[in-house]
Amino acid sequence: ARMGAVCVDFDLYGYGESEQEVGREAHRTDRAHVYQAACALKLLDYLWNHRHDIDRSRIGANGGSGGGSHTILLTVLDDRITAAAPTVNLASHFDGGCPCESGRPIHLAGGGTCNPELIAMFAPRPLQIVSDGGDWTASVPTLEYPYLRRIYGFYGAQDKVENVHLPAERHDYGPNKRQANYDFFARVFDLDRTMIDETKVTIEPSRMMETGLER
């Protein structure tokens, strides 16, 4: 947001204030997958139709781990996304460790697919895959990324897909992964690079983010 973007986030199903409504156990269900996807689409509808400070030509999606899975799903469901950066989730052999991100899983439908095939449908729009050496994304530089470059190559757009691989890191959304995504969206959306420094960010207390549900 400090770089000039309007940023939107929401509670996962069964997490945060949502836990007060449906219980934490509801998160590890396939309905969480559907609900979270619907929330993302409705929030995008709101931004698209009611916010006059939104540039419709610059709509990005980003998330880590299960959020990366939903980033991929959102690019499949909605053509309004113009750049995406799924982080520490992409693998051809693993669809996610929770029903909240994989459904029943959806990857078994219609003869079967995988997340790299799903995100390949995003071509030729700008795409960055962030991976590391300590989880299932370790294969991205040698398997999933070459596959995506081949797909993007059919559009003459191999320069639109990139991979930031951090071989010494593990499964998290740490500072190096965040910085990689800041840089990606700054380049693609022409954001203010001088505001990338996280040390100037104020972390608001959680109560400031609540809508008012009783604890």
Whereabouts are the PLM-identified features?
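Alpha-helix capping and helix-loop boundary segments enriched in small/acidic/polar residues
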Residues: 27-38, 61-72, 105-118, 132-139, ...
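Primarily recognizes the serine-hydrolase "nucleophile elbow" in alpha/beta-hydrolase
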Residues: 45-111
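Alpha/beta-hydrolase-fold serine-hydrolase catalytic core, especially in secreted/extracellular enzymes
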Residues: 123, 130-215
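An acidic- and aromatic-residue-enriched active-site/binding cleft used to recognize and process polar
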Residues: 12-15, 64-67, 77, 86-90, ...
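Loop/turn elements at helix/coil->beta-strand transitions in domains of secreted/extracellular proteins
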Residues: 3-6, 55-58, 79-83, 124-127, ...
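Cap/lid segment of the alpha/beta-hydrolase catalytic domain
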Residues: 1-50, 56, 90-100
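The feature captures the conserved acid-bearing segment of alpha/beta-hydrolase catalytic domains
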Residues: 83, 95-150
